[in-house]
């Protein structure tokens, strides 16, 4: 899906923050698309990561991506969309999915030590660094101004130093109501939950609730306000995430072209 915020390109994200496991990567590749009578399909192949090296070409193999789905207006007021996608890399020196980001997290410096400077604040990186397969299912239903969007996601993989695969799951559901002239105003809520196994076998989970509202001042200018509450469970007592939580209000304005 393309619902995440990327720098000032936040028009498609009704909330300030992205998902806890943020599915973002930059890779060079090609894709082939098919569309007919509401059905859609895509297959693609990439170079596996952006910053390649000629010194050890055997470290990274191509990544495979694919998507299938159905998207159609069932009536004048009802739109239905259901898609499933997969990303697979058999071998890479450093997987960017869930780990890389050009913009950084919107919850700046939360759950970080004083001297910390991570761009992943408030996010979870499953650390499936060298081998990964990720599946995602996205249902979307819109009836008049009311819309539902969901995420069912599972990522499995490991670091090169590990012998067994680890699995991470992500679930999210959001409900948005758009109103006003040309639906230029909206209110909504999102629940996001992630659980999985860290390197070393520790089972953890993170939950987040977001409540927000937005105003499209023009089609290119969006202002948002959001309340967020996030909690961490099961983390090592020696880490800052042990029994961690944060909450607060974020205000954001963006101009996107």
Locate the predicted segments by residue.
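Outer-membrane beta-barrel pore domains
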Residues: 78-88, 94-257
């Amino acid at each position: 899906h393309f619902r995440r915020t990327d720098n000032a390109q936040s028009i498609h994200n009704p909330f300030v923050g992205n998902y806890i496991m943020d599915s973002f990567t930059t890779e060079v590749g090609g894709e082939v698309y098919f569309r007919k009578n509401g059905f859609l399909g895509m297959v693609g192949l990439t170079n596996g990561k952006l910053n390649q090296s000629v010194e050890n070409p055997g470290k990274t193999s191509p990544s495979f991506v694919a998507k299938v789905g159905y998207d159609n207006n069932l009536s004048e007021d009802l739109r239905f969309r259901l898609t499933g996608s997969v990303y697979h890399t058999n071998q890479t020196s450093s997987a960017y999915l869930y780990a890389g980001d050009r913009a950084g997290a919107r919850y700046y410096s939360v759950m970080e030590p004083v001297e910390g400077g991570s761009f992943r604040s408030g996010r979870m990186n499953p650390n499936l660094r060298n081998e990964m397969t990720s599946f995602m299912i996205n249902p979307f239903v819109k009836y008049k101004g009311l819309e539902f969007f969901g995420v069912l996601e599972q990522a499995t993989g490991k670091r090169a130093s590990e012998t067994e695969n680890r699995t991470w799951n992500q679930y999210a559901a959001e409900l948005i109501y758009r109103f006003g002239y040309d639906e230029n105003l909206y209110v909504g809520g999102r629940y996001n939950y992630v659980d999985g196994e860290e390197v070393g076998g520790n089972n953890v989970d993170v939950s987040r609730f977001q409540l927000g509202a937005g105003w499209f001042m023009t089609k290119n200018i969006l202002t948002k306000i959001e309340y967020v509450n996030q909690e961490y469970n099961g983390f090592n007592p020696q880490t800052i995430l042990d029994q961690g939580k944060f909450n607060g209000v974020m205000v954001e304005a963006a101009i996107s072209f």
